[in-house]
């Protein structure tokens, strides 16, 4: 019998429907894989075997009764940012020590309503602040990929590193993730998986721990494009509890898979050619262009002139919002509390002990740019730049471009505890150079594996679409996937 953990969601769905396997068997296969590998990979910060088996049994009963829902019996991993009722939800931060919410996030509730099974909570950068999953209170996640002939442990990307590593190492059928500046697309690119950041407002933010509220968006990481489409259909919904949720029906994304892209116009932005970009990345981009041209798409050069300002503007806007959002963690109602001589002392000691170094850095930056003397010079100017970035994309789309193709990341995965990056936070921030524009403009973006670099590590291509045209991204990404093939890490763990 095939190893059940090697099945895609679509394949598992077919076998469950045909009663060739049961949801309990599938869930047990994943729980066994987690038990064997998690000590090494560190993808999960909490595993919920009893809950998983109980949900799988209920799925088997519904399948037997002919009442199977869209994700019936499919075992998923949930990023630790999503509120899961009565289960560890700590945003991988010490300050939320012991926190178990009394509510369920809208996205996870949608998944459970569609019959999905929860395997546990996935590791991530603390409060989703990071590009390498090294800022987690629970330690770094190891990428299931290694360079040819090397034993060096690599990062899986961030902040959704646990989600990407778990999918790549087959420790779940698919995973939820979030993306504020690239936190779905960059880890997907580093691990040879598919990740989509939907349009801002497509998935509810209710019950998801906030980082930067005007940028945060939930989405799936999956093994292939079809699985990502299946997951997004279940995750997305209109939600009156989230004021930024957009009242548009959720299409059947899976129906877009396999559609022709003949006649589509694909924009290639000249500003994405950055100094020092590895030859492998440039070659992959050219290969992606050739694949889409061969499939009948028209390739057009475009300009997004304000791209160069996106990263500095992002690292003003996001920390400013984080500084406001994270002010609520004070040790009074929940999470960690460090006693002090008075309430102010208690606040200071709790926050000093509870937040990690990178989170403290971003709170400090955010508080600084919002302070009276600097608000106009930094925050207001960054918001104006954001408007210009959005306008660049609008003009490109108005000129007839259907989607935009770029590299997903400026490099392949790098080593854990890389000294060069550890000593210079700005170098780490540069990992987001190709992804932040999409969040600043609120657009959908998908990362799809395009090939391996000369070290044998996966590289991703990014497609950027018009607002709420995720179907265009899925059908175009599927063309790339068909041409490039799928990539699986050789097991060393």
From Swiss-Prot:
Q: Which Gene3D superfamilies match?
A: Amidase signature (AS) domain
Q: Which InterPro entries does the entry mention?
A: Amidase, Amidase_CS, Amidase_dom, AS_sf, GatA
| GO MF, one annotated term | glutaminyl-tRNA synthase (glutamine-hydrolyzing) activity
UniProt entry keywords in alphabetical sequence: ATP-binding, Ligase, Nucleotide-binding, Protein biosynthesis
Catalysed reactions listed for this entry: L-glutamyl-tRNA(Gln) + L-glutamine + ATP + H2O = L-glutaminyl-tRNA(Gln) + L-glutamate + ADP + phosphate + H(+)
Cellular component terms per the entry's GO annotation: glutamyl-tRNA(Gln) amidotransferase complex
Q: Which residues form the active site?
A: 79, 159, 183
**Recorded superkingdom:** Bacteria
List the Pfam families.
Answer: Amidase
Give the EC number(s) listed in the UniProt record.
6.3.5.7
**A GO BP term, please?**
translation
> What does the sequence similarity comment in the record state about its family?
Belongs to the amidase family. GatA subfamily.
Subunit structure, per the record? Heterotrimer of A, B and C subunits.
Query: Function, please?
Result: Allows the formation of correctly charged Gln-tRNA(Gln) through the transamidation of misacylated Glu-tRNA(Gln) in organisms which lack glutaminyl-tRNA synthetase. The reaction takes place in the presence of glutamine and ATP through an activated gamma-phospho-Glu-tRNA(Gln).
Q: Name it.
A: Glutamyl-tRNA(Gln) amidotransferase subunit A
Organism this protein belongs to: Rhizobium meliloti (strain 1021) (Ensifer meliloti)
**Source organism phylogeny:** Bacteria, Pseudomonadati, Pseudomonadota, Alphaproteobacteria, Hyphomicrobiales
